[in-house]
């Protein structure tokens, strides 16, 4: 309702009384605090973009009992690659074994001096990667002379790897896709429009999953024929939308 007495109205017009002008001349040049109100800034919070990951790998089980920590670097239809660490001595090893024991069963243990974070077993051998190093160990000749190691620059590290029949592929933090022969010769260096998320390989085919742009969550894929050096398929990866109710209850 209306006020009957103007004297009851609080003086909030932004001006200084006449008898205060001399002492408060600076206040006159400044509007009242309530003269302008900034609109709240609303920042839309979207989903976090998918980072790189290695297919068929696991993390160390935090509930591991005993002195040895184990994690699968790879578990596929061919076999498994397991990284182990003795918590007492700090000794690290990598073990590879076939599901079909007629192919050789368990391979000799690989001493891990660099801390391998990625691993995959292919038709010709085992590919391991850590920091700025990749290491390939073939099955046919499980000797030191048959293996090879490649050192990349310190600012480029492997993020996901794959093994085909006669090639190995390494995606790196510099957004490069490097393809090598099983003997260690580099065949291709490709660059994608967005970060590579994961790789998978079979026979001569290499599947690449990547983000459309660096800040985007949209995922795309390409399937490359490494032997013929052609792109066989390409498209978008369908993803379900986030469910806010499930997110709130999680």
Which residue stretches match the model-derived regions?
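Surface-exposed loop/turn elements that mediate protein-protein interactions on large endomembrane-trafficking
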Residues: 93-111, 133-153, 174-190, 216-243
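Acidic and/or Ser/Thr-rich intrinsically disordered tails and linkers
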Residues: 2-140
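A broad "ordered helical/assembly scaffold" signature
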Residues: 55, 78-83, 165-168, 172, ...
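Canonical WD40 repeat/beta-propeller blade segments in eukaryotic WD-repeat proteins
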Residues: 108-119, 151-162, 189-203, 208-209, ...
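Short beta-strand elements that form the blades of beta-propeller/WD-repeat-like
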Residues: 71-90, 117-131, 159-162, 166-171, ...
């Amino acid at each position: 309702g209306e006020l009957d007495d103007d004297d009851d109205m609080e003086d909030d017009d932004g001006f200084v009384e006449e008898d205060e002008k001399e002492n408060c001349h600076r206040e006159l040049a400044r509007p009242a605090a309530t003269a302008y109100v900034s609109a709240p800034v609303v920042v839309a919070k979207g989903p976090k973009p998918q980072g790189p990951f290695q297919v068929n790998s696991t993390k160390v089980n935090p509930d591991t009992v005993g002195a040895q920590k184990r994690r699968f670097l790879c578990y596929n239809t061919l076999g498994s690659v397991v990284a182990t660490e003795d918590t007492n001595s700090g000794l690290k090893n990598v073990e590879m074994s076939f599901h079909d024991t007629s192919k050789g069963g368990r391979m000799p243990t690989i001493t891990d001096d660099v801390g391998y974070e990625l691993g995959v077993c292919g038709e010709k051998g085992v590919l391991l990667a850590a920091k700025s190093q990749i290491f390939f160990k073939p099955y046919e000749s499980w000797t030191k002379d048959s293996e090879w190691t490649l050192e990349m620059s310190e600012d480029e590290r492997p993020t996901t790897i794959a093994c085909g029949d006669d090639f190995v592929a390494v995606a790196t933090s510099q957004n490069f896709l490097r393809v090598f022969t099983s003997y260690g010769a580099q065949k291709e260096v490709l660059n994608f429009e967005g970060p590579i998320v994961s790789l998978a390989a079979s026979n001569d085919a290499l599947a690449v999953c990547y983000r459309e742009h660096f800040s985007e969550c949209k995922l795309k894929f390409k399937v490359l024929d490494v032997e013929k050096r052609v792109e066989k398929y390409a498209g978008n990866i369908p993803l379900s939308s986030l469910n806010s109710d499930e997110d709130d209850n999680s």
